[in-house]
UniProtKB/Swiss-Prot annotation:
The gene is SLC11A1. The chain crosses the membrane at residues 56-73, 83-102, 140-160, 165-184, 194-214, 238-256, 285-304, 347-366, 398-415, 427-447, 464-485, 494-513. It comes from Bubalus bubalis (Domestic water buffalo). This is Natural resistance-associated macrophage protein 1. Residues 1-38 are annotated as: Disordered. Belongs to the NRAMP family. It catalyses: Zn(2+)(in) + H(+)(out) = Zn(2+)(out) + H(+)(in); Fe(2+)(in) + H(+)(out) = Fe(2+)(out) + H(+)(in); Mn(2+)(in) + H(+)(out) = Mn(2+)(out) + H(+)(in).
Length: 548
């Protein structure tokens, strides 16, 4: 199966052992094949030469993917890391973004080479029980991400209305605005991608404005960015580092990106076209994640400058002397270090730099919440279709996800206070980190299979780097669990944690086992797991084509 052309049952070699037959026309995708049922044609240019026209044609999926790097959970993680550690964790943000890019590169390659997304490949290769458990974990990650978007949007509405819209009211508004944004589907793929680009621009301008007015110390900022150290750090700083990793590298985003790249018309019978598509998607993802990194850097630097080592009393005094003195009581009058969240963050910016800073912060937060809503909807639909072969309309899919997200959020908003809502945001960031192995292990497994990826399978360097990412994430998660268990409020919780830990370790062990098979540990392959070495049997391929 090497070379540009060759005989096969379909008249031409198709890369990826589970590839589907060619689509009937250059503009028409198979039903459900892309997120808008259409494909973007790629212009013909001089072979081997870089083309801005081609880069523009491939631009879109990477920026949609980058939205997950900018959701309200990321904003909360950024500002808390700045408030807790100053500039000391900027290097964690930088390298988490680089590691995220490496994972997204693998996701894009899988989609381009095989013509199927990660959920579809999992459906074909994993047995039923692990497959269902894996699907449930990714759905949990999607609901958790959606809860963060609901929280961020509700707080943005509260800030923009000067408190006239209560938090529970903001939560309910998110139901309406979500369905409004679904109407964007009717305006075509490129217009939808342009709208997401507009929201990213809003975030860059609003959070960039906060960076300019805060004027962080540039020397200390550069030192924190490029010197990986954390002098004097303890458990609070470590938990913030875990939160950064969980917020930046989100499990469902890997599944999302592997499906988004299918929206471009790539001739998978030609290895040159596949190689070219991989290159352009990598360039686009690098540009998109560079923008997202700068936006996250703006937020962390602003709060590292304005909030680091601030006490509640100091924050109270700052607001009491400002034009926003009515907000001062949200800060307790004590000398404890202030525990900032996305609501208090907007308030203190307004107290320090004027009301405009507060409203600009709220607009950026609103853009983060709204953009993440749409990408979360697409991720949920792709995951459900891929794992279960169950096709729902986006309306039904968003109704399910948003209902699961809103119920606990609105209960907290009604019966508890803002601090509990922000605390939930922090917990959800850690949840994303805990669930990350259920995306990284499958993508590493399948992109390392020569039977599936052929000449585009991971090389030794890629395997080592991605495996190192996985070991790092698992080590950090293990440390978090060991640190968290002693703080459980009641002994009865220990049995629940033990049950969840057993299920978690069982599924992780299975995924590691199959991953090791593809990395060269052939002695681990038995019976049906031979497919991880040699691809699917011919009859399984045919079933995959008819059901996929």
């Amino acid at each position: 199966m090497s070379g540009d052309t060759g005989p096969s049952k379909q008249g031409g070699t198709r890369y990826g052992s589970i590839s589907s037959p060619p689509s009937p026309g250059p503009q028409q995708a198979p039903p459900g094949g892309t997120y808008l049922g259409e494909k973007i044609p790629i212009p013909d240019t001089e072979s081997g030469a870089f083309s801005l026209r081609k880069l523009w044609a491939f631009t879109g999926p990477g920026f949609l993917m980058s939205i997950a790097f900018l959701d309200p959970g990321n904003i909360e993680s950024d500002l808390q890391a700045g408030a807790v550690a100053g500039f000391k964790l900027l290097w964690v943000l930088l390298w988490a973004t680089v590691l995220g890019l490496l994972c997204q590169r693998l996701a894009a390659r899988l989609g381009v080479v095989t013509g199927k997304d990660l959920g579809e490949v999992c459906h074909l290769y994993y047995p039923k029980v692990p497959r269902i458990l894996l699907w449930l974990t990714i759905e949990l990650a999607i609901v958790g991400s959606d809860m963060q978007e609901v929280i961020g949007t509700a707080i943005a509405f509260s800030l923009l209305s000067a408190g006239r819209i209560p938090l529970w009211g903001g939560v309910l508004i998110t139901v309406v605005d979500t369905f409004f944004f679904l109407f964007l589907d009717n305006y075509g793929l490129r217009k939808l991608e342009a709208f997401f680009g507009f929201l990213i621009t809003i975030m860059a301008l609003t959070f960039g404005y906060e960076y300019v007015v805060a004027q962080p110390a540039q020397g200390a900022l550069l030192q924190g960015l490029f010197l990986p150290s954390c002098r004097g750090c303890g458990q609070p700083e470590l938990l913030q580092a875990v939160g950064i990793i969980g917020a930046i590298i989100m499990p469902h985003n890997i599944y999302l990106h592997s499906s988004l790249v299918k929206s471009r018309e790539v001739d998978r019978s030609r290895r040159a076209d596949i190689r070219e598509a991989n290159m352009y998607f990598l360039i686009e993802a690098t540009i998109a994640l560079s923008v997202s990194f700068l936006i996250n850097l703006f937020v962390m630097a602003v709060f590292g400058q304005a909030f680091y080592k601030q006490t509640n009393q100091a924050a109270f005094n700052i607001c009491a002397k400002s034009s926003l003195h009515d907000y001062a009581p949200i800060f307790p009058r004590n000398n404890l270090t202030v525990a900032v969240d996305i609501y208090q963050g907007g308030v203190i910016l307004g107290c320090l730099f004027g009301p405009a800073a507060l409203y600009i912060w709220a607009v950026g937060l609103l853009a983060a919440g709204q953009s993440s809503t749409m990408t979360g909807t697409y991720a949920g639909q792709f995951v459900m279709e891929g794992f279960l072969k169950l096709r729902w309309s986006r309306f039904a899919r968003v109704l399910l996800t948003r209902s699961c997200a809103i119920l606990p959020t609105v209960l907290l908003a009604v019966f508890r206070d803002l601090r509990d809502l922000s605390g939930l945001n922090d917990l959800l960031n850690v949840l994303q980190s805990l669930l990350l192995p259920f995306a990284v292990l499958p993508i590493l497994t399948f992109t390392s299979m020569p039977a599936l990826m052929q000449e585009f399978a991971n090389g030794l360097v890629s395997k080592v780097i991605t495996s190192s990412i996985m070991v790092l994430v698992c080590a950090v998660n293990l440390y978090f669990v060991i640190s968290y268990v002693p703080s459980l409020p009641h002994p009865a919780y220990f049995s629940l944690v033990a049950l969840l830990a057993a299920a978690y370790l069982g599924l992780t062990t299975y995924l590691v086992w199959t991953c090791l098979i593809t990395q060269g540990a052939t002695f681990l392959a038995h019976n049906s797991h031979q497919r991880f070495l040699y691809g699917l049997p011919e009859e399984d391929q045919e079933k995959g084509r008819t059901s996929g």
